[in-house]
């Protein structure tokens, strides 16, 4: 018994930080340093949300397209509306579940980082740690002024809040993810039952609106959903841009000499 005790004491002799801990303690520290939060769950959740967003964007776009087509033929819009409502509802439910999973994962990651900070602080301390030093470290406060030596202190970094730029984004920029979702949805072929009248997928996202009137006259059934939405957005956004530019031109005050009357007699 005495020989084992002497071996244990020799193992933790205070000749340096590497000798302060026993073999079991060093093993625990090594395992704690190797713990990494699983990122696969986060990636899968993001992929699922993006897939549901694609379905919702396609359903909403199809509802808008069928409104024009089926009103001309006197058909009901219940089926496209039901598909859009179902897609949006599924997106909401999955968003709630993903938020809860992200919250729990954040707590887990916070505990792991806190443990690593404490263990890193313990490695730099003596074999015996004072209670007030540990409490001051965990609370982020200065230790009581009864020790001549200033103990290490945890740097409490306040979360920086990035002030968003006050630049107003245009409608086209805001709807860019919506257009990308429809385009990728058409390429992947998912939710084909929603796109009842869509043509062959894979059409380009950015199309000019010059051919929109001719295609409308030829009928909307031959136009795929991606092309239809791109032409609609280009048509309406271009009209809004022209109106704003013309209004700005009217507000300009010309100071040309031709507009001044010569009052000299």
Curated annotation (Swiss-Prot):
> What compartments host this protein?
Nucleus; Cytoplasm
State which residue ranges cross the membrane.
none
Any GO CC annotation of this UniProt entry: cytoplasm
Q: Give the start-end ranges of region Disordered.
A: 1-22, 140-173, 194-219
- Which InterPro entries would you find in this protein's record? HAPR1 (IPR040308), HAPSTR1-like (IPR029196)
> Would the keyword ATP-binding be found if you checked this record's keyword annotation?
no
Question: Compositional bias of type Low complexity: which residue ranges?
Answer: 147-172
Against Pfam families, the record matches this protein to: TAPR1-like (PF15251)
Keyword entries, A-Z = Cytoplasm, Nucleus
Q: Which GO terms describe its biological process?
A: cellular response to xenobiotic stimulus; negative regulation of signal transduction by p53 class mediator; regulation of cellular response to stress
Major subcellular location class:
nucleus
What is annotated about its quaternary structure and interactions?
Oligomer.
Protein role: Acts as a central player within a network of stress response pathways promoting cellular adaptability. Functions as a negative regulator of TP53/P53 in the cellular response to telomere erosion and probably also DNA damage.
Q: Which family does the similarity line name?
A: Belongs to the HAPSTR1 family.
This one is known as HUWE1-associated protein modifying stress responses
**Species in which this protein is naturally found:** Danio rerio (Zebrafish)
**Gene transcribed to yield this protein:** hapstr1
């Amino acid at each position: 018994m005495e020989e084992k005790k002497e071996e244990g004491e020799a193992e933790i002799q205070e000749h340096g930080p590497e000798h302060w801990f026993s073999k079991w303690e060093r093993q625990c520290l090594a395992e704690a340093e190797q713990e990494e939060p699983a990122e696969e769950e986060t990636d899968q959740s993001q992929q699922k949300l993006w897939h549901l967003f694609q379905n919702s964007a396609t359903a909403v776009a199809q509802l808008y397209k069928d409104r024009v087509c089926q009103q001309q033929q006197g058909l009901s819009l219940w089926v496209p509306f039901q598909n859009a409502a179902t897609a949006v509802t599924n997106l909401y439910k999955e968003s709630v579940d993903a938020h809860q999973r992200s919250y729990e994962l954040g707590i887990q990651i916070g505990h792991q980082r806190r443990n690593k900070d404490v263990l890193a602080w313990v490695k730099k301390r003596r074999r015996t740690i004072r209670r007030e030093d540990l409490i001051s470290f965990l609370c982020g406060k200065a230790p009581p002024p009864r020790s001549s030596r200033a103990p290490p202190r945890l740097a409490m970094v306040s979360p920086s809040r990035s002030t968003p730029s006050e630049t107003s984004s245009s409608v086209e920029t805001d709807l860019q993810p919506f257009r990308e979702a429809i385009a990728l949805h058409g390429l992947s072929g998912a939710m084909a039952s929603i796109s009842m009248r869509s043509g062959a997928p894979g059409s380009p996202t950015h199309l000019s609106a010059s051919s929109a009137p001719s295609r409308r006259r030829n009928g909307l059934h031959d136009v795929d959903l991606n092309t239809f939405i791109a032409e609609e957005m280009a048509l309406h956004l271009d009209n809004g841009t022209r109106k704003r530019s013309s209004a700005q031109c009217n507000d300009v005050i010309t100071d040309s000499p031709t507009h001044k009357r010569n009052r000299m007699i």
